[in-house]
Every structure is written in C-alpha cells, then in structure tokens.
C-alpha cells in the first residue's frame, strides 16, 4: 500500500534533479567557454587588450670559446588603438665581452606598429607594420649603437580551442647612429605553437630564429615548455617556462641552450 507514494516521490525527485542539472549546464558551459577563450587568446600577440609582459632569457652556454653565460631580461608593453597595435620592448642585457668578462646594461628599445586586418574570422589575427629600433643601450656590448628601421608581420590562429599557432617575421637594418659601430641587417622568424591541456595548463613553444645577414651568422632553436593561464578580476595572467635547444647555428657567441621564462598580463 505504501509502495506507490514512495515510487512517485522518487520519480518526482529525479525529475527535479534533472531540471536542476539542465538549468545549471548553460552557466557551467559558459564558464568553461570563457576560460577556454581566455586560454586560447592569452598568447596572442595581436589580442585586442593592453598587455604588459616580463620575459627573461637565461643563456648558460654559447658557441665558440666564450665561457661566460648571458642573460636578457625584457620589459614588453602592448597597446591597441583603433586598427593598430603598438608593441614596445626594452631589454636589460648581460653580455660576454671576453674570457671571464661581461658587460651589463640597458639594450636597444624596439617598437613596432602592426595594422590589424579584418580576416573575416575572429579566431584568426593578422597584422603588419613598421619596426623601429632606437640606440638606448648604456654599454657598447648591450646594444648596436644604431638607429634601425624595418618591417614586422604577425599571424595568429586560434580557431581551435585546443591548438593555437602562428608566427612573427621581422627584418631591420641600420639607417644612422654611431659611424664607428658595425652595420646591422637582421632577419628573425618566431614560430609559436600552443596546446591546451585543460585547467588553464598548456604546452608551448616560441623560439626565435635569428639570422645576422651582415655578419653571416645565425642560430635556430626549438622550444618545448609548459604554462598556466588564470584570471583574476579583469586581468588574465600567464606564467610559463620554456627550455630552448639550438639545433643549427653558425658563428661564435650563438646560444646553444636558453631557458625562456615569462609572466604576462592582459588587462580587459
């Protein structure tokens, strides 16, 4: 006699739980989508957000007879305005100058402006524009002593929530400065690739391949590291560590191994 009310009660509870679960799914799904979007855009150099980054390259081994280590700590600021994005980088370098000798100081200020094209897909970003380098170095060894101009082009593809990729190409040459210093002609290519692992964690690589056309030297590293993206308020934080190994090089003083670490902030 009492089995029917019990069965009805259980059926009612199951229905209520099902309705509650369905009501919560959109919110949970939206949260997951927001977190996924933040992670996929956290490494986009053309993201439409003001950004401030702290990057460091520690180089414990250089090619040739150089025995000292090198280091480059970089302050990087990016600011969109209209259809343009400005990115400025100021390094503080420690550079070997001989056996058991190094010089430390500010490096050259590097600024480029990228015009952002409408690709027709919000997941794809492309920008191209002029690059300017100013001789702000405080020591001869930490800069070129030259004013330089060039061109920069950037592409970033975030159409996949799991895998993002792209690249940065730059070329610059000197147009003035200290006449006693060597001329400059440098081409650089930076492929980047990121695989989302869930929970804000991701695998990454963003090595810079540098070709000094004036001195006929180059180094080509590959990188594989790990990072973590998390959000606090309106700021997206991104921390990472990426070992980079040089697979091809020509000339003395080229990095053989470097550890690239960073702390990025995007302000929304």
What is the role of each PLM region?
Residues 1-39:
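Cleavable N-terminal export/targeting peptides
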Residues 25-268:
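Transmembrane beta-barrel domains of Gram-negative outer membranes and organellar outer membranes
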